[in-house]
């Protein structure tokens, strides 16, 4: 017995509904990003299947980007809880085991939108973390205007984290909706007919 064509929709349905809950839900916590990361990780298991003109490879890139950005969005929470070192080790092991290098795809002559987005977002994440680390090691008397800035805006780095992560989450949500439409129309689950009068 062959599986229903609608079974292909299940991971994308889970991504779109859980991402919508995270983005538009009332009083969601930073840890709520783990809910959409579960089906995104499920989508990553299809990396070896290169059918569909590279569509599955692009899905893998979107899922890895979302997982890395989801981990980065939890950085302020984990740093506050004293889990910064565990976060680094887990992130490096995760990307190393996957063989993911965000800037490698740019060497290709046909770099995709998600490859450029991933490279830019990963560069932004690194810059933000370097800025936060450099501010943490500066002595208080080193820069008067810098210490005044952080006294006035103590949550500057968590806000910058949100400003970097939220557009990526919105794009992942829109991508999952686009995949819904593509799979639905391609599998015949939804047939668009034109009535003839």
Predicted regions and their residues:
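Non-catalytic interaction/regulatory modules that flank or connect domains
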Residues: 1-4, 8, 175
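Transmembrane alpha-helix segments characteristic
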Residues: 5-22
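Juxtamembrane/transmembrane-helix boundary motifs in multi-pass membrane proteins
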Residues: 5-9, 50, 54-58
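Transmembrane helical bundles and short interhelical boundary loops of multi-pass, membrane-embedded
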Residues: 14, 18, 54-197
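Transmembrane alpha-helical segments
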Residues: 40-49, 94-98
């Amino acid at each position: 017995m062959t599986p229903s064509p609608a079974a292909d929709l299940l991971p994308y349905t889970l991504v779109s509904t859980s991402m919508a809950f995270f983005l538009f839900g009332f009083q969601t916590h930073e840890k709520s990003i783990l809910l959409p990361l579960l089906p995104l990780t499920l989508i990553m298991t299809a990396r070896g299947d290169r059918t569909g003109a590279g569509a599955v490879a692009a899905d893998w890139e979107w899922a890895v980007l979302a997982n890395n950005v989801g981990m980065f969005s939890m950085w302020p929470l984990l740093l506050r809880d004293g889990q910064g070192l565990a976060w680094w080790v887990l992130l490096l092991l995760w990307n190393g085991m996957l063989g993911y290098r965000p800037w490698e795809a740019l060497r290709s002559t046909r770099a995709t939108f998600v490859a450029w987005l991933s490279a830019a977002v990963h560069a932004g994440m690194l810059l933000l973390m370097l800025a936060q680390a450099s501010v943490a090691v500066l002595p208080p008397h080193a820069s008067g205007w810098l210490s005044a800035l952080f006294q006035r805006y103590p949550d500057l780095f968590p806000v910058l984290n949100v400003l970097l992560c939220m557009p990526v989450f919105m794009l992942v949500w829109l991508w999952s909706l686009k995949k819904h439409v593509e799979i639905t129309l391609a599998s015949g689950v939804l047939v668009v007919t034109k009535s003839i009068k």
